[in-house]
Amino acid sequence: MADMSPRTDTSTDDTDDNHMLEPGQLALAAASDSDRSKDKHEDQKTLRRLAQNREAARKSRLRKKAYVQQLENSRLKLTQLEQELQRARQQGIFISSSVDQTHSMSGNGALAFDMEYARWLEEHNRQINELRSAVNAHAGDNELRGVVDKIMSHYEEIFKQKGNAAKADVFHVLSGMWKTPAERCFLWLGGFRPSELLKLLSTQLEPLTEQQLSGIANLQQSSQQAEDALSQGMEALQQSLAETLAGSLGSSGSTGNVANYMGQMAMAMGKLGTLENFLRQADNLRQQTLQQMQRILTTRQSARALLVISDYSSRLRALSSLWLARPKE
């Protein structure tokens, strides 16, 4: 029995030593688990960021693709419209005689004028390209003068077309619905402001002689005065029209009041009839400004001026196309 005690004690000591090592091992295991959990959390954050970046890149590609598709659709629509206009011209919708044209405007109104303007603009662009080629080729003054005169005559044609269109629908012509949205922002009484056009040209045609600068300044001043007079006339017409329509508002529907109402409408209609006159005067001012500008400038300067005017209008139309085709977000 005595011999058994040491072995029993030794066994007990070994067991105690094993128990003393277990807390350290547990701590190491806990630390290892914590590191693994932390690494796993960091990996998840990284994966989430990568997923978010991929999603943002995907959405960016989709937006870019949609924008490109909208531009392509706009180009296709423009091509389709040009083809429809070409077919319409081949079918004889555009009438050459002024009497028949006026009758056509009465029947087709705004649509007929819009199609006429598209045809005019197509021919105008062709003539501008011809002028640009002549300028770049350093053509002589005689050749340039022939192209410049042709473009000036073409401007007279659109003024005549606007006059005919106004007889059918003066509101359509005045509002500029036949123009692109960006062009309408700068519209004045159905067209460009002569004074603003001269201001643009004076900075684009340098160098100019003192006599030319003086001539353009005087022309700009007289154009501005004429514009102010027409604008004031339009304001007076609007005020008078508003007062006429506001008369006896809210009155009962008796026979006398009905007759009064009809009388007011007749007066208002008569006043609206003067809108056509305002448009005609504004177009006359525009036409005279172009003619005076041609007299002040040399042939080569006149050619450059027509190119500047055309390029400015083209940029406004391009801006409208880009604006309408932008992503709608």
UniProtKB/Swiss-Prot annotation:
Residues 110-326 form the DOG1 domain. Residues 33-46 have a biased composition (Basic and acidic residues). It is found in: Nucleus. It comes from the Eukaryota. Residues 45-65 are annotated as: Basic motif. GO terms for biological process: defense response; DNA-templated transcription. Residues 71-85 are annotated as: Leucine-zipper. Keywords: DNA-binding, Nucleus, Plant defense, Transcription, Transcription regulation. One of its GO terms (molecular function) is sequence-specific DNA binding. One of its GO terms (cellular component) is nucleus. InterPro entries: bZIP, bZIP_sf, TGA_domain. The keyword DNA-binding applies. The keyword Transcription regulation applies. Residues 43-87 form the bZIP domain. Residues 1-48 are annotated as: Disordered. Belongs to the bZIP family. Interacts with NPR1/NH1 and NPR3/NH3. Transcriptional regulator involved in defense response. This is Transcription factor TGA2.3. It comes from Oryza sativa subsp. japonica.
